Each structure stands twice: as C-alpha cells, then as structure tokens.
Amino acid sequence: MRPELDLAVTGGTIVRGEGRAALDIGVHEGRIVALAEPGRLPSARETVDARGLLVLPGIVDSHFHCRAPDHPEREDFDSGTAAAAAGGVTTLLEMPISDPACATPEVLAQRMALARSQARIDVGLFAAPGDLDAPRLQEMAAAGAVAFKLMMHGAPPGRESSFRGLALTENRDVYRALELVRETGLLLAVHCEDQGLIDLFEAREHAAGAAGPAAHLRSRPVVAEALGVARLGALNEAVGARVHVVHMTSARAVEYVRWFQARGQAMSAETTPAYLFGSEDDALRFGPFVKVNPPLRTLDDQAALWQGLRQGAIATIASDHAPFRGAEKAPGWSDIWAVGAGIPGVELTGPLLWDEALRGRVALEQVVRWTSEAPADLYGIGRRKGYLREGADADLVLLDPEAERELTATDFHSRSADAIRHVLGRRCRGAIVSVWSRGERVTEAGRVIGTPGRGRVVVPDALAGTAAVLEPEPNASAARAESAARAESEGAP
C-alpha cells in the first residue's frame, strides 16, 4: 500500500506560542497535514524519530539584508540562506539595502528572480517607497512585496544609490509614504533615527577629533531614536497606516511606542539579539565589529527591551543581518567613521534565544511567538509560515534541549563570518539536530544540505489566489545548477 504521508516526525514535543504538546507531525507535499497523538499517524515514506527533542516552527527572520548583486562577496542569497538555515531560520524577509535599490517594480522583479535562483530556503522581499509614485507602489504590492521599508535618516556617504527611495528624512516625504503604503494595505517598517540630531552630534565628535568606538555611541544617542519614533507616531496619527518600528534599542523608544499603542495606533515594534544581549560595554570592547545603527545602549535599556517584549509593546525579534567582512570592519579601530554599520547575525538569533529559554530566563513558548508566529502574522504570511498547525508549510527545527554548544569561528556559514567576534566562546544550551523547509531536510548534523535554488519567493497570503508563492521560471534549474557549482568551487556549505 502506498504511504499516505511523505514524512512523519514522531515522538517529539512540539512547542508553539500557546504551549507544548506531545504530538506527531504528518507531512504531505511540503505541508503539515496532521498533528496526531503519538502512534496515530498513517504510514509515511520517511519517519524521523524525535524522541527527547523539541520540535519548533522554523524562525521567520523579518529583518535581513542580502548584499547581492553589488557586494556578493559580503553575502548573496546562496550564502545568506545557508547561514539562515544553519541557525534554524526557514523564512527570510529581506529588506532593501542593495544597488540598484529595490524601489521600482522592475528592480523588485529582478530581486525576486535572483532570490529564486540562489535561495536554499524561502524568501520574501520588502520594497522601498521610491519616488513616492502611487501606481508604482501599488504595482510592487501586487507583485508580492511583503511590506515597505523606509529610513528616517540619510544615506551613508558613498552608499547613496543603495538607499535611493529608502532614506526619507523630511516629514513631508514620510507623511506621503505613510499615505501611499496605507493604500496598499501593507506594513511600513521604519528605521527611526532623526538625521538632524545625528548631524549635530557627529559634527561635535568630528570637531573634537574623536574617531574611536565611543564617538559612534555619542553620535547617535537615545534622543535621536526617540525623536524618530515620536515623529513617526505623530505623522501616522493623521494617516492611520500600519507601522513597525525596527531594531528598537532604548527604554525611551519602548515608552513612546507603548504610548502610541495605548492611543489606538497600529504601531508595532521589533528588537534584535544585538540589543538584547549587547551593551555599550561590548561596543567599547569589540569596537567596529559591533558597530550598528542605532548603537548598543546601556544595561538599563537592555532590561527595558526584555520588559517590552514580555508586556507586548515589542512584538518581534529579528536578526538585522547586515554583513560586512572582517577586513572591512577592522579599520574602524582607528577610524570608526570609515566602516559600515552592521553585524552578520542571522545564525545567532535562535541559539542565543533558545539558550536564554533553556536556562529558565524566558519561556520557550514566548521565543517561538517572537521569532516565528508574530512576524508571520505581522507580514501577512501566517497561513503558510511561522506556525505548527495543519495547512502550514512543514518548516521545522528539531532541537536537542540537553545538548550544549560553544560558538566558535568555524561554526558560521555567512560569507562575512569572520566579522563575528562578540559571541565567540559563548556556550549555548540547545543544539539543532536538523532543519526542515517545506518537508525537506536542509540541515543535518551541522551541515547545510539544502541546495541553492530550492527556495521559493513568499508573498502575502492575501495574494494566495494568484501568487502566494512565485514558482521558479522554466530556466531555474540551469541557474540552480550554476549556483550549486559555484558554491562547491568556493567551498561554500
């Protein structure tokens, strides 16, 4: 008799935001078709013994930057999705900081094609508001953008083309972007820092001849972030768009977001492991290797972020994976202004948060909510992604809660892995046994085995009748083979 299931995951404990349960998972054609009491599943082609393991939904990392096509040596969709899979991420939502900027329907289509040809797991794409042309924004939404992203600060010197249509510093432009994005029905994710204040504080540091890591901290203080959140909230009170404050860092920003939420505004927020586990002390110790915008804050701010998560003011945790190679970062010890801001963190979110949970500091169910379910809901992909339930994609992480691993330089898969310094030597409880994307095993025993080009481009569930997942073009197999050959020749995982 032909097996009814393609895959059965048996004997494990599934972990969802609502709680834990001893349930077996049945998978057919890439989707979960059954959650059954132990021993009650029909026959399957493959059965995975998950006794003693936790079964989690794959992470939906909703803040990731791929550097291709202009800087593939830092990261492309091949290496970036390999790194993601190694960290338990099964869906990436990629925010535009690339050249050409993802601010037109044409570039969005090119970026989707690039992702389809290289990705090992599923990828969704943000678009930028561009030149604030209503028909173009509507076209990008109809093509499958998961959301729009803007930055309230200006483009870094020399990177203007990558930020074109993304960096909007004037209130009138932010207001117009809010109006236009509201009409698409999508979310607007916003980097909240005020450029005028950044200019003031940077000028003071330059005038004093300051160029060390502490100068960067002083150049982007909490007030710059708080003013950005306040401006966004005040403008949006008149517009009524759905807005999401990304990589929030400070107690003051949490307070402001909570205030706007209490007034009924559709404002949500995100933070990242960099701010939950790092502080100003780390910025001084690791210098350019943890230079991020906004910068790392005080331990009091860190505590406020955890409180904001527990109380619901902050909805999601994402990596803000923004890779630069180690050689690009190192000159920042003598001149912090000369190096880019960003950490290659897509492989760190799961291990750091699972460790926190397995040590009893936070509930693992909450971690699942913050990293999988909430981002899937927020970006409108929760029908297929982020959940362990019937009908969802079989995106699974099998985690051994009794194992412990030390984070070492050889662990990481990003092309910019040599810039990861701040977590080396850290011991984390919980070790990934395997990761599954749509019912296919993509990691095993620490190796990434998912092939380049197997990933799909995910679009909002609202487009499910037309293009919920954009399938590869007819020539995708050739592109996939070429990408795999290149990865092998470069020694990629």
What are these regions (language model features)?
Residues 1-57:
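Histidine-rich, glycine-flanked metal-binding segment
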Residues 12, 30, 52, 63, ...:
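Divalent metal-coordination and catalytic microenvironments
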Residues 50-118:
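Metal-associated gating/positioning segment near the N- to mid-region
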Residues 93-94, 124-127, 242-247:
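Short catalytic-loop micro-motif centered on adjacent basic/acidic residues
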Residues 113-129:
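A glycine-rich helix N-cap at a beta->alpha junction
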Residues 135-317:
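Histidine/acidic residue-rich metal-binding segments in metalloenzymes
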Residues 214-240, 289, 311, 315-317, ...:
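His/Asp/Glu-enriched, well-ordered alpha-helical/loop segment
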Residues 331-335, 341, 390-458:
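C-terminal cap of metal-dependent C-N hydrolases
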